[in-house]
């Protein structure tokens, strides 16, 4: 892991020491709810746009995958009898809605951005194409990948890992509401211990729930590091990208 960031330096001055040139940021749909119980909190969107804009400002290429849990949760409907594939397709549409909202927030902050969907939605967003996405990233546009993998039975965590591998990102950053991975739920257990670093096999063997099994196996097979961090902490994303110690690193070890 890199040395702690020199906090006396400006982000621009630290850019040469930046650990990551291209990242894939995974945001949960629930993160967009903010203080509400459902939907999208504009204040949260604006704050996220500001933090993402800071990365773009120092030359970091940013891809984003957003979940859809703030708008649609298929588990309850599936339990009530809805077909799983139908529920997954509805969840994919929810991620497109979140992607459009994020694009709007970014563009209001004068940050060029694109939404690409794994399922064709002509006239609404672009259809995902790897080569086109990489061209956008290289030119400085933020690319928001929506509709998951385009297939049912795959989570947005798996989609984030897949897109990160496809676009040759340096790391997948999973934004959560806690500052890393713990041996047990830190909300319920005051003695929960935080891990600074884990291997892929540690996560699988200890069933730590960082991501689903498919996602962890995917990043392990392609040696894609994952860092879990607290997106609600102001400045954490920028500090992490320029080399600061935030959250928990999951890699080959």
UniProtKB/Swiss-Prot annotation:
Its EC number is 2.7.4.22. The keyword Nucleotide-binding applies. Coiled coil: none annotated. It comes from the Bacteria. ATP binds at residues 26-29, 69, 73, 176, 182, 185. GO terms for biological process: 'de novo' CTP biosynthetic process; UDP biosynthetic process. It holds the Pfam family AA_kinase. One of its GO terms (cellular component) is cytosol. The keyword Transport does not apply. It is found in: Cytoplasm. It is an enzyme of class 2 (transferase). Pathway: Pyrimidine metabolism; CTP biosynthesis via de novo pathway; UDP from UMP (UMPK route): step 1/1. UMP binds at residues 68, 88, 149-156. Belongs to the UMP kinase family. Homohexamer. PANTHER family: URIDYLATE KINASE (PTHR42833), URIDYLATE KINASE PUMPKIN, CHLOROPLASTIC (PTHR42833:SF4). This is Uridylate kinase. It comes from Chromohalobacter salexigens (strain ATCC BAA-138 / DSM 3043 / CIP 106854 / NCIMB 13768 / 1H11).
């Amino acid at each position: 892991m890199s040395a702690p960031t020199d906090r006396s330096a400006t982000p621009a001055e630290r850019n040469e020491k930046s650990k990551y040139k291209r990242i894939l940021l995974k945001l949960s749909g629930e993160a967009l709810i903010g203080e509400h119980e459902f939907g999208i909190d504009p204040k949260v969107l604006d704050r996220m746009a500001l933090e993402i804009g800071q990365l773009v400002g120092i030359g970091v290429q940013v891809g984003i995958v957003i979940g859809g849990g703030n708008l649609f949760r298929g588990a309850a409907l599936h339990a009530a009898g809805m077909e799983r594939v139908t529920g997954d397709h509805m969840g994919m549409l929810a991620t497109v809605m979140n992607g459009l909202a994020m694009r709007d927030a970014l563009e209001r902050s004068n940050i060029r951005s694109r939404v690409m969907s794994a399922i064709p939605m002509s006239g609404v967003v672009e259809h995902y194409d790897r080569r086109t996405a990489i061209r956008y990233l290289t030119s400085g546009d933020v690319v928001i990948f929506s509709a998951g993998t385009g297939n049912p039975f795959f989570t947005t965590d798996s989609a984030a890992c897949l897109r990160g591998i496809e676009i040759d990102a340096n790391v997948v950053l999973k934004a959560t509401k806690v500052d890393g991975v713990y041996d047990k739920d830190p909300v319920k257990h005051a003695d929960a211990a935080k891990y600074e670093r884990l291997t892929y096999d540690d996560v699988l063997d200890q069933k730590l729930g960082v991501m689903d099994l498919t996602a962890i196996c995917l990043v392990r097979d392609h040696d894609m590091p994952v860092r879990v961090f607290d997106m609600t902490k102001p400045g954490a994303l920028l500090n992490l990208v320029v080399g600061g110690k935030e959250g928990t690193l999951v890699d080959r070890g």
